[in-house]
């Protein structure tokens, strides 16, 4: 090997990724061309944009993506005149990938089935940003020769996809990239111009950068129309064309749940073509905070980092195109341009209005609920992050409920409130089933009071930020037990409760400082104990999240509430009256309340022993002799 050739091992995760891509997506191999062509077009767009502020980077007049099959050499070359890559870029972009990305990709492969059983694995490639590696589905060796625009050196990256790659100096007259695929024996179809033309027209027809295919005689034929679909009148666009464009910008295989195509005219003029997906992406949308809307100026791609929509609408894909911005504005200046800020507000309002109209369509309530199941957790972030839009977002939210079988909304909840009910009650936990069985609900159910059941991670944060809805305060049931005294239980009156002063005093003494208070409650029916948040500070679920994040919680300890009508509490009260030491039993009660609330016992071993002793009857004996 030449001394100038550097050999590098792939990051450990790249080898695993290559194996996943090659074997899991083998039957959909044609998507490799979609990914490589899309990357080449993006590189061309990025060079065009950078040239606006640096004339030395100007694109050549014949800039295009060129696809050139060579039957004699059994190679397929994809070339562009784009921004190119330096030696460091090649190593970083093609030699490493985040460990978390590979793990998420692997998990998603196993779950890639649509609602009707269709195979959705091909859509994973683009969503996880691993499109380049799809080349190894058809090639047993890949070489990439690239020269960075503005740079003097070219470098070649080469690999057989089996654990390592090489880097060596190369020669390229102009900036750009050549990707050469040395095709496998079973990939002959990608040496045929007609097959390549079919794939490009299927997957890349709307890419604005010209794409050409060179045949065996050296003749080049245009392979894409490159039309700016969003600039055409809606009446001239078919549903199938909308779907194809959506799949191009989203890298998905589903159909759009909503298509928004409009032109704003007047003081501010722009065109928007946006899509709301009908399926949740495989990469958790909560984690993927990248913008999905591209900014174009006079049809020219400028950036996908303009944040044309707020983070809480990041599930929306599409394009916004305007003539009201200069072509040569830098990305840094772009963020503070008043025109762009106005476009952001207008585009956000348009999306909210669309969601609002659909949420009010009672004939298609199931359709909106499906959307909310996919993206509701992200939409809720808007309550927390966007003060100006909270009032608009709140009616769009949907919730499970302690009394309703399906989903409900805040307006519907308010319409069902009891006359004497002062607040909108909610309970937060990690999953809906735990919520439905929570002891926290017993007193509210006994009084026929509806409680909203919240199980998304963000649900611990946004209710406090919203504060009120239609002048009704939002209140966690872990903080709202005192309100129950104002509401009468339904059905027969409960039996009188015994006085528990001695037991309460004993429990307080035994449990300090783990609880801030012990008190008798009327909100329990079947359970012996429950935890409540103190009057000051966040509710219990927020406290748990803070502890899990290692941030601690400096507020008051929780309150332990006991049910005076429960047999266990009555038995312990008798023992307290008799002067017994109840320190061990007090600890078990607190741990029992913690477990009921989805938390862990303070001392799991001691708790397990106490439960085992109870099952053996050792706890019950004093009660039997009383």
From Swiss-Prot:
Keywords, ordered alphabetically: ATP-binding, Chaperone, Cytoplasm, Nucleotide-binding, Stress response
Entry-linked InterPro entries: HATPase_C_sf, Heat_shock_protein_90_CS, HSP90_C, Hsp90_fam, Hsp90_N, Ribosomal_Su5_D2-typ_SF
Stored PROSITE patterns: HSP90
Segments for region (C): 545-626
CDD domains: HATPase_Hsp90-like
Region annotation A: where it falls in the sequence: 1-331
Keyword Nucleotide-binding: yes
GO molecular function: ATP binding; ATP hydrolysis activity; ATP-dependent protein folding chaperone; unfolded protein binding
Segments for region (B): 332-544
Main function: Molecular chaperone. Has ATPase activity.
Record-stated family: Belongs to the heat shock protein 90 family.
Name of the protein this chain belongs to: Chaperone protein HtpG
Species per Swiss-Prot/TrEMBL record: Methylorubrum populi (strain ATCC BAA-705 / NCIMB 13946 / BJ001)
């Amino acid at each position: 090997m030449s001394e100038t050739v550097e050999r590098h091992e792939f990051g450990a995760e790249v080898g695993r990724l290559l194996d996943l891509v090659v074997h899991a997506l083998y039957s959909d191999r044609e998507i490799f061309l979609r990914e490589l062509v899309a990357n080449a077009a993006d590189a061309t767009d990025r060079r065009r944009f950078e040239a606006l502020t640096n004339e030395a980077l100007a694109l050549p007049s014949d800039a295009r993506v060129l696809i050139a099959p060579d039957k004699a050499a059994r190679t397929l070359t994809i070339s562009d005149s784009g921004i190119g890559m330096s030696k460091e870029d090649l190593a970083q972009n093609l030699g490493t990938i985040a460990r978390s990305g590979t793990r998420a990709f692997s998990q998603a492969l196993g779950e890639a089935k649509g609602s009707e059983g269709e195979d959705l694995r091909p859509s994973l490639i683009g969503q996880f940003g691993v499109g380049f590696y799809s080349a190894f589905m058809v090639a047993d060796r890949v070489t990439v020769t690239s020269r960075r625009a503005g740079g003097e050196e070219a470098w070649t990256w080469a690999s057989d996809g089996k654990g390592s790659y090489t880097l060596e100096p190369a020669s390229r007259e102009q900036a750009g990239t050549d990707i050469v695929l040395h095709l496998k024996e079973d990939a002959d179809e990608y040496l045929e111009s007609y097959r390549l033309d079919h794939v490009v027209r299927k997957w890349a027809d709307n890419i604005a950068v010209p794409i050409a295919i060179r045949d065996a005689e050296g003749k080049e034929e245009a392979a894409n129309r490159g039309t700016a679909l969003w600039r055409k009148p809606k009446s001239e666009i078919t549903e199938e064309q909308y779907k194809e464009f959506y799949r191009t910008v989203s890298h998905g295989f589903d159909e759009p749940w909503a298509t928004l195509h409009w032109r704003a005219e007047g003081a501010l003029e722009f065109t928007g073509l946006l899509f709301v997906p009908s399926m949740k992406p495989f990469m958790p949308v909560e984690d993927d905070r990248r913008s999905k809307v591209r900014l174009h100026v006079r049809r020219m791609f400028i950036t996908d980092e303009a944040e044309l929509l707020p983070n809480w609408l990041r599930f929306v894909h599409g394009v916004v195109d305007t003539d009201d911005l200069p072509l040569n504005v830098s990305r840094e200046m772009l963020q503070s341009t008043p025109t762009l800020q106005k476009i952001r507000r207008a585009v956000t309002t348009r999306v909210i209005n669309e969601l609002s109209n659909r949420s009010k369509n009672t004939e298609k309530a199931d359709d909106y609920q499906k959307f909310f199941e996919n993206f509701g957790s992200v939409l809720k972030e808007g309550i927390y992050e966007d003060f100006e839009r909270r009032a608009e977002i709140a009616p769009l939210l949907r919730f499970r409920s302690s009394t309703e079988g399906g989903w409900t909304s805040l307006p519907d909840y308010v319409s069902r409130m009891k006359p004497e009910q002062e607040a909108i009650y909610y309970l937060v936990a990690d999953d809906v089933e735990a919520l439905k069985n929570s002891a926290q609900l017993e007193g509210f159910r006994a009084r026929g009071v509806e409680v909203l059941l919240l199980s998304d991670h963000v649900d611990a944060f946004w209710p406090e930020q919203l504060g009120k809805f239609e002048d009704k305060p939002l209140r966690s049931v872990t903080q709202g037990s005192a309100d129950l005294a104002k509401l009468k239980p339904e059905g027969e009156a409960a039996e009188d409760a015994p006085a528990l002063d001695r037991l309460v005093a004993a429990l307080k003494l035994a449990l300090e400082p783990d609880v801030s208070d012990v008190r008798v409650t009327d909100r329990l029916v079947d359970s012996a104990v429950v935890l409540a948040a103190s009057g000051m500070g966040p509710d219990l679920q927020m406290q748990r999240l803070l502890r899990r994040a290692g941030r601690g919680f400096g507020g008051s300890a929780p309150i332990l509430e006991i049910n005076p009508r429960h047999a266990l509490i009555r038995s312990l009260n008798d023992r307290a009256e008799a002067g017994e030491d109840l320190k061990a039993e007090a600890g078990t009660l607190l741990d029992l309340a913690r477990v009921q609330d989805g938390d862990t016992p303070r001392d799991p071993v001691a708790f397990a022993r106490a439960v085992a002793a109870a099952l053996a009857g050792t706890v019950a004996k004093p009660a039997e002799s009383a």
